[in-house]
Structure formats: C-alpha cells, structure tokens
Amino acid sequence: IIGGVGKDDFGKCLLDRLKSDGVDVSHVIENPKKATGCAIVTYFDDGSRKFIFHMGNTPAVEAKAPQKDVLDGVRYFHVMGCSLFADIEFAKEILKAAQTAKKIGAKVSFDPNIRKELIGEKETDKILENLMRLTNVFLPGEEELLLLTGKETVEEAVEECFKNPELEILALKQGSRGSKIYTKEKTVETGIYRIQPVDATGA
C-alpha cells in the first residue's frame, strides 16, 4: 500500500491493522507534523449516506510513485479513486505509478469511490480520464458509473466504458441487488446474501 498517515494514534491503529493482515506498509509515510486523514459517514432515515472528508492536511499526499524495481513482480495495481481528489500533485503521482505498473505488465484495477462532494477540478478530471484509459478492471457503483461516463442509463454507460480497449472486466456494484460482472463477451449477475444490514460502508 502507498500513502501516508500522521504519527498519531489513529495512524498507528491503521498501520497495525494492515500489518496484522500481512500488508507491506513500507511505502506508507509517517509524518509527526500532520494528522491522519479520515472520512466520516453520515446516515439518513431513507438509507442514503453523505461523506464528510477531512483530508486537507493528510500526509498521504506526500507519497511518491515508487520506482520501477519496487513494482517488479506486481500483477495488479489497485487505485482507490477518492485519493485522486486529496491533492492534485498526489493525483499525478498515482497516475505515474499506474503508468509504471502497466509498463511492467501489471493490470490496473480501479474503484472510483467518487462522491459528488469531491468532483470539480478540471486538472483532476483529466487525470481521472487518463487513469480510466489504463484500467483493466473497473469497479464502480451505479451512480459513479453514470457520473463518470455522463450517460443516462447503465447500458449506455457500460457500452461507453468498453470503448476503452484496455478494459477487460467491469464489476458493477448494486448494493442490495447484488452485482453484475460485464466483459466484452458476456454479462453475469451475482446473487446476494439475505441479511439485515448494519453498516454498508466498506462492506
């Protein structure tokens, strides 16, 4: 994982959890002068959510794209979309890292995780467009899919995405309705587990 945390209890908690799960955190910066960024999720009675982001002073944006030799052997390079909106220079580093990963033969997977609260900067939109061109595995929700393609229906949006010759799989997340997996050849609908949801964030 590439990013950054503050040298605070929240940052320590995150690093400890990642380490316990076997994640290599050697490319995570620890900055004693800045606070670990966070996102707060608010829930409403109708089941909708709103995200409040506190990333203005996050050390994560200081992370740099790793050198090519660091990525040797990497088969998939995953990008979490909300990181693109934390800082324009950080977004450029993310794109640079994805480009390096492609050059060594890795696949790029992209979960846009984009909220309307984060969109607006033209320069960031251009980086997003370039990242989409590199993407082999795309993991949007319905709202994100329509937002990113500018289309009115899911079918039109999926068709637009597959104009990218690099795209191999589009996994559309549909919440309580399960998900649909699209490839150029076929579409597969997945089933769902019938549960009483407690918290959908990060599920």
Label the predicted regions.
Residues Q99, K103, K151-A203:
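Conserved phosphate-binding/catalytic region of the ribokinase-like
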Residues I2-G81:
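Conserved N-terminal subdomain of the carbohydrate kinase-like
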